[in-house]
């Protein structure tokens, strides 16, 4: 009787399989990290483009209407929200995407960033404190309404006039939105040195972490969401950094950019 030698099937041992899986994990991680970074960069680029389009739309609105629009409220479905007198109901709210025709929007009518968070918008509500501006005809520049969001107020007051009462020698049109590099001093930032101290509008995205609670993000991000006239724009930092986590993307409109656009459209002389 002939006995056949059993055939030995060669295969991976458990140890060898474990080693292969570990190596595969390292390779996969090395591939995913650049992919994640590329996606984040693409999202930021898309959001910056949305913010720039929003800024251009605001300038176009001012060219057509002689003023800036009010922010949208949480209940206005993306429509600018003035009260019956024409004054804005809020200073900071959501970008009025329905009024300005900006895309993309969500189901509530809010313009959104690449992370589907609503774009925020603030506008100066400053009103010339002196009432009558020197040299203006009776009935002009005396309305007790915000200068930059009220019909014809920018044109009525004009860009060349100065306050007739203290503070003297400052423009009668004097927007008050400010942007700082942060609340915490760093090698890159001295908080007292403002990036701009007279913006007419600020538009910003709350970034990838925009859906988190205030307790989960940095102080500068919390301050932006609660701001009326002072906002923060700086280099992005991770959680645990000296200045705190920050990934907001912020743009603004200088009054001189607004004036130039309105002059070109014949809305300002």
Where are these regions (language model features)?
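N-terminal secretory signal peptides that target proteins for export/translocation
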Residues: 1-8
């Amino acid at each position: 009787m002939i006995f056949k030698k059993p055939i030995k099937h060669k295969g991976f041992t458990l140890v060898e399989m474990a080693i292969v899986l570990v190596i595969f994990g390292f390779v996969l991680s090395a591939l995913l990290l650049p992919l994640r970074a590329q996606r984040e960069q693409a999202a930021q680029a898309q959001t910056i483009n949305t913010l720039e389009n929003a800024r251009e739309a605001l300038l176009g609105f001012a060219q057509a209407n002689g003023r800036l629009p009010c922010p949208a409220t949480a209940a206005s479905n993306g429509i600018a929200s003035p009260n019956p007198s024409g004054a804005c109901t809020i200073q900071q709210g959501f970008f009025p995407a329905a009024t300005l025709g900006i895309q993309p929007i969500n189901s509530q009518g809010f313009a959104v960033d690449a992370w589907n968070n609503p774009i925020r918008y603030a506008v100066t509500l400053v009103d010339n404190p002196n009432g009558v501006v020197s040299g203006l005809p009776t009935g002009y520049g005396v309305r007790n309404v915000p200068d930059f969001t009220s019909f014809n107020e920018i044109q009525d007051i004009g860009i060349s006039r100065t306050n007739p009462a203290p503070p003297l020698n400052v423009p009668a049109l004097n927007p008050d939105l400010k942007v700082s590099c942060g609340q915490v001093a760093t090698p890159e930032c001295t908080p007292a040195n403002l990036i701009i101290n007279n913006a007419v509008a600020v538009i910003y995205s709350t970034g990838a972490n925009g859906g988190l609670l205030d307790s989960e993000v940095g102080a500068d991000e919390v301050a932006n969401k609660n701001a009326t006239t002072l906002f923060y724009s700086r280099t992005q930092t991770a959680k645990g950094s000296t200045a705190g986590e920050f990934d907001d993307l912020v743009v603004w409109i200088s009054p001189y950019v607004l004036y130039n656009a309105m002059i070109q459209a014949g809305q300002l002389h």
